[in-house]
């Protein structure tokens, strides 16, 4: 019978606490720590005051392809890949740091971030398994999440070519410098 390291267990508890505070689901905690399911549930209840949410994790790449989700996922993924390439961190530590950068850079609505930590972690797994990748936009040059093996030079991001429903959803700014270009864009669209 092998003895568990007290130091490793303390690290796992600290990691689990950090992940829970960032909104991780139980499946992510089980995958990234060596703590038992029972201990993770007790820790989750102690920190959040309620049991962890039940249900399956997202398993489709389609969520990351819709326009607004793609922008958020791409921001996170670019931060994650930068951290990996520079060697500043790796593994789940890179996911946590990239997610914190994403939260700092994207103003969050009251109902919470568009890209939850568990979904960001799922994105990393999709990228690592080759289902998704970052492709360069042929208009702006930015790197955005696409399905794997996107033909080079054929991708235009949803910032350069937003879907029509994205334009309808946009609200006019109160700042006069912003209103004039928005009104001109809408007049051109109506004329066409």
Swiss-Prot record:
InterPro entries: FlhC. GO terms for molecular function: DNA binding; zinc ion binding. Its main location: cytoplasm. Binds 1 zinc ion per subunit. Keywords: Activator, Bacterial flagellum biogenesis, Cytoplasm, DNA-binding, Metal-binding, Nucleotide-binding, Phosphoprotein, Transcription, Transcription regulation, Zinc. GO terms for cellular component: cytoplasm. Disruption phenotype: Double knockout with flhC decreases invasion of host cells. It comes from the Bacteria. It holds the Pfam family FlhC. GO terms for biological process: bacterial-type flagellum organization; positive regulation of DNA-templated transcription; regulation of bacterial-type flagellum assembly. Its cofactor is Zn(2+). UMPylation of FlhC by YdiU inhibits its DNA-binding activity, which inhibits the expression of class II and class III flagellar genes, and interrupts flagellar synthesis. Switching off flagellar synthesis facilitates Salmonella escape from the host immune system. It is found in: Cytoplasm. Zn(2+) binds at residues 137, 140, 157, 160. The modification O-UMP-serine is found at residue 31. UMPylated on Ser-31 by YdiU during infection. Heterohexamer composed of two FlhC and four FlhD subunits. Each FlhC binds a FlhD dimer, forming a heterotrimer, and a hexamer assembles by dimerization of two heterotrimers. YdiV binds to FlhD which inhibits the ability of FlhC(2)FlhD(4) to bind DNA. Belongs to the FlhC family. Functions in complex with FlhD as a master transcriptional regulator that regulates transcription of several flagellar and non-flagellar operons by binding to their promoter region. Activates expression of class 2 flagellar genes, including fliA, which is a flagellum-specific sigma factor that turns on the class 3 genes. Also regulates genes whose products function in a variety of physiological pathways. This is Flagellar transcriptional regulator FlhC. It comes from Salmonella typhimurium (strain LT2 / SGSC1412 / ATCC 700720). The gene is flhC.
